[in-house]
């Protein structure tokens, strides 16, 4: 005799892996050109000074320098400056 009744099957129990989005460099952090600043879907943060935007909306540094997150006209920007601001 079985200790418990037959369990049956379920159609749940799956989940997708996390996409590792978000900030990769913090405000005031120094990094080299080509470094990824922010991974995102859509333009949650816009590219500012010395920052490029990839096909998947990833923000990356165009020059060596310090990352600065700024807010202008109800938009968030990520900029890179060669001197710390």
Swiss-Prot record:
Cysteine pairings via disulfide bonds: none
Alphabetized SUPFAM superfamilies for the sequence: Ribosomal L27 protein-like
Record keywords, A-Z: Ribonucleoprotein, Ribosomal protein
Region annotation Disordered: where it falls in the sequence: 1-22
A Pfam family this chain is assigned to: Ribosomal_L27
Family, similarity comment: Belongs to the bacterial ribosomal protein bL27 family.
The protein's name: Large ribosomal subunit protein bL27
Organism name: Mycoplasmopsis pulmonis (strain UAB CTIP) (Mycoplasma pulmonis)
